[in-house]
Structure formats: structure tokens, C-alpha cells
Curated annotation (Swiss-Prot):
One of its GO terms (cellular component) is cytoplasm. Homohexamer. One of its GO terms (molecular function) is ATP binding. It comes from the Bacteria. Pathway: Cofactor biosynthesis; coenzyme A biosynthesis; CoA from (R)-pantothenate: step 4/5. Pfam families: CTP_transf_like. ATP binds at S10, F11, H18, G94, L95, R96, E104, V129, R130, P131, I132, T133, A134, T135. The gene is coaD. Its cofactor is Mg(2+). The record marks H18 as: Transition state stabilizer. Its main location: cytoplasm. This is Phosphopantetheine adenylyltransferase. It comes from Bradyrhizobium diazoefficiens (strain JCM 10833 / BCRC 13528 / IAM 13628 / NBRC 14792 / USDA 110). Reversibly transfers an adenylyl group from ATP to 4'-phosphopantetheine, yielding dephospho-CoA (dPCoA) and pyrophosphate.
Length: 165
């Protein structure tokens, strides 16, 4: 039976922190479903289609190199429900610090109550990417700052173009 993992997030935009999680996740599964949560009340910087392409272009080669299939999808329900729909038994969550751990432990407990067959796996961020958040990347890029050390080159180019006009 293939090991399917589900990695949910907004990925607006994908950062080197997200990519770090993907690098650590792909050896754990045969298929990694990277899923963009779509919520009608939120106004993302990048469209869903742009984020899906970013995920495929940036994370796809990392997965392929590890012998893992990457699938970029969207979902608009609970992440644990979406994980089940994709046949995942592993929920991937990245941790930057203790604050993330406290929050993610609560989510993991609730998810386990709703779907005991989906096990949360916490992947600690590598030291170089711990301070990176998509929110800070958007703010820095929006003010003309250089984000090239925080995001993959493709994403840096897309951010520059997004804020050029």
C-alpha cells in the first residue's frame, strides 16, 4: 500500500521554509499531496492557479529526485477531511518554534479525534529557514526589499513582477 502524505498550507508564496519541509517529507512517503487551502474570505497575493504552478515548479523536482510523486491540489474544507479524500495517512506539519508546536499540537489532537487513521508528523525547520514566514516575505517584497534569500529564485522573480506595477 503506498504511503500518502498530505501537506496543507496557503503557500502565498512558497518560501524556502516550505521547501525545507517538502525536502524532509518526501523520503517519508511515496506520494506527497501539497494542498492549498482556499477560503472565500481571504484575499491572497497570488491566485490559486499561480500558487499551484509555483508548487509544481519548485517542489516537483525535489520530490522526483527523492523518488516521490508530488501532487499539488486545492481544498476548501478541513485539512483532515481533505487528507482523507486523498487517501493520506500522514499529515505533514512544519515547526519553526515552540509557538508553532503549541498550536500544531492542538490541531493534531483535534485531527486525531476526527480521523484517527491520519497521523500528524512534525518536521522541525532547518535552522537557516526558521525565521521565514510567507507574511514577512510578502511585506518585505511589497516594500521593495530583497527576498531572494527567503524564497526560491522563481518565486523571487514572481514577487518582483507582482510588485513592479
Amino acid at each position: 500500500m503506498p504511503r500518502i502524505a498530505f501537506y496543507p498550507g496557503s503557500f502565498d508564496p512558497i518560501t524556502n521554509g516550505h521547501l525545507d519541509v517538502v525536502r524532509h517529507a518526501v523520503p517519508l512517503c511515496d506520494r506527497l499531496v501539497v494542498a492549498i487551502g482556499v477560503h472565500p474570505g481571504k484575499k491572497p497575493l497570488f491566485s490559486t492557479e499561480e500558487r499551484l504552478r509555483m508548487l509544481e515548479d519548485v517542489c516537483g523536482p525535489v520530490a522526483t529526485q527523492a523518488g516521490c510523486v508530488l501532487e499539488a491540489v486545492t481544498f476548501d474544507d478541513l485539512s483532515v477531511t481533505a487528507a482523507r479524500k486523498h487517501g493520506a495517512t500522514i499529515m505533514i506539519r512544519g515547526l519553526r518554534d515552540g509557538t508553532d508546536l503549541d498550536y500544531e499540537m492542538q490541531l493534531a489532537g483535534m485531527n486525531e479525534a476526527m480521523a484517527p487513521e491520519v497521523h500528524t508528523v512534525f518536521l522541525p525547520a532547518s535552522p537557516m529557514v526558521r525565521p521565514i514566514t510567507a507574511t514577512l516575505v510578502r511585506q518585505i517584497a511589497g516594500m521593495g526589499g530583497d527576498v531572494s534569500t527567503f524564497v526560491p529564485p522563481l518565486v523571487a522573480s514572481l514577487l518582483k513582477a507582482k510588485f513592479a506595477g
